[in-house]
Amino acid sequence: MDSAARPVSFPKSRWYAKSSKPKAPYKLPESVKPPQSEQPSSTPKPEYSAEQTEFDTKADPAGNAAPEASEATESKPQQPLPDLTQGIPSTLAAELEGRTKKSGQTSLNLTEDPSRFEDYTDDGRGDIPKDGYVSSLDRRRARMANLMYAFFLLAGAGGVAYLGRNWETEEEAKAHPDIPSGWSFSSWYNRMKARLSDITSYYKDPAFPKLLPDEDPNLRQPYTLVLSLEDLLVHSEWSREHGWRIAKRPGVDYFLRYLNQYYELVLFTSVPSMMADQVLRKLDPYRIIRWPLFREATRYKDGEYIKDLSYLNRDLSKVILIDTKEEHARLQPENAIILDKWLGDPKDKNLVALIPFLEYIAGMGVEDVRPVLKSFEGTSIPVEFAKRERIMREKFEKELEEERKRRPKRGVGSLASALGLKSTRTLDGEQSPSEGLAQGKMLWDQIRERGQKNYEMIEKEIRENGEKWLAEMAAEEEKARQEQMKMMKGSFTSMFGAGKQ
């Protein structure tokens, strides 16, 4: 029991901190030291600065050893370790620093010498080639793109070569009679060009091969007058105060209603139908203009909209085009009368001044209008026609006076027969041509009088029945619209099976 209560004794010991004195540098024994060569007594002065202690060395391994810190306070403090719980730290700075040390520092190109441009621009790649930065996915995409380019190039070349094949049908050969079949390069090229033109003709040529329908010549006027719209019959302008405004040219109603008895009136404009149709409804509410043609009926060539009269389905020897742009009549300039643009002058009379000339052509039954228009080329048609008319009138009066002197006792019929006219009777009680000649009236004077009477009749009908005509046309349009809506509803319901069985 005493032994159990006796306290346990332990040997006493002390722990002391070790000294942190720096160790002396290790020195090689004299036996292993390399022999030292004799140094020259006089050495040239170095070109480097004496302050750089790295160059102040001797050929002694012991002396070239890096000196150790003499005291612990002179050693650099240890940098804290990175916290890996926040992720692996970036090594970009170390890589860039190593690359810079490897490639070496380059001084600035202060002279901006183009020959040294490559020394300063490496795009951050160093010695690594450019394709080393391209991923494998990008390489596959580039290869696929090159293959697609090559495929499309070969397909296009093959398609173009296929277009130059011989004509396969008689219709194709008849459509291109000046391009025969054959395997010469010129024939192949012409066939290819013709087929390409046929493909693009859908967008460049008029919508229909015949813009006007076939009609019995006995039921219509023998001559066709084609009129432009913009700056000929109307003029449109825009201002900040009023926006778009459209003005009607002075004398347009008289011009259209008077010449309607001689010509088949056609409106041919390069303005789209969705815009020009609304203007035409206000300009000509009574439908004096028989056929309206819009941009869809023009021909597009070299950046211009051309009015090709050969698509009108009318005899070009009896077609006259009145326009304000020469480009519109480029294909048939011999059929065109080009006027100056009307810019809104309310006192303009140039359009009405053309009526006597146009009336003369239709009233006298000119076989071909093109030589007549050619004779007025480079002149003002109203002024030149007035001069020629005055000369013809003087000549007519002179011949008439001479004929009266030679045959004073002859009647009116003999005088008319001498001038090449036969005595005829009119059913409406009008004066016969022979009677008019006896009174000193030229033939086109009588035609003009008859035209004035017909115009007065047209004006009377419009005044008396114009409102009725407009109401009837509005009712017809509304009926057509209702029928169209009914058809659209029927087709829509039939798509879902709800139509009438």
Swiss-Prot record:
Major location (coarse): mitochondrion
Gene Ontology biological-process entries: protein import into mitochondrial matrix
The keyword Cell membrane belongs to this UniProt entry's keyword annotation: no
SMART domains in alphabetical order: CPDc (SM00577)
Keyword Protein transport belongs to the record: yes
Mitochondrial intermembrane side: 165-501
Segments forming domain FCP1 homology: 218-361
Cellular component aspect of the GO annotation: TIM23 mitochondrial import inner membrane translocase complex
Keywords carried by this UniProt record: Membrane, Mitochondrion, Mitochondrion inner membrane, Protein transport, Transit peptide, Translocation, Transmembrane, Transmembrane helix, Transport
Region span, Disordered: 1-125, 423-442
UniProt transit peptide range: 1-16
Composition-biased stretches (Polar residues): 34-44, 103-112, 423-434
Compartments in which it is found: Mitochondrion inner membrane
Comp. bias regions, Basic and acidic residues: 113-125
Membrane-topology annotation of the record: Single-pass membrane protein
Residue ranges, Mitochondrial matrix side: 17-146
Transmembrane regions listed in the UniProt entry: 147-164
SUPFAM superfamilies xrefs: HAD-like
Pfam families in the record: NIF (PF03031)
Gene3D superfamilies xrefs: HAD superfamily/HAD-like (3.40.50.1000)
Function: Essential component of the TIM23 complex, a complex that mediates the translocation of transit peptide-containing proteins across the mitochondrial inner membrane. Required to direct preproteins in transit and direct them to the channel protein TIM23, and possibly facilitates transfer of the translocating proteins from the TOM complex to the TIM23 complex.
Entry-linked PANTHER family: DULLARD PROTEIN PHOSPHATASE (PTHR12210)
Subunit-level organization: Component of the TIM23 complex, at least composed of TIM23/timX, TIM17/timQ, tim50 and TIM21/timU. Interacts with preproteins in transit.
Family label: Belongs to the TIM50 family.
The name this protein goes by in its record: Mitochondrial import inner membrane translocase subunit tim50
Gene name in the database record: tim50
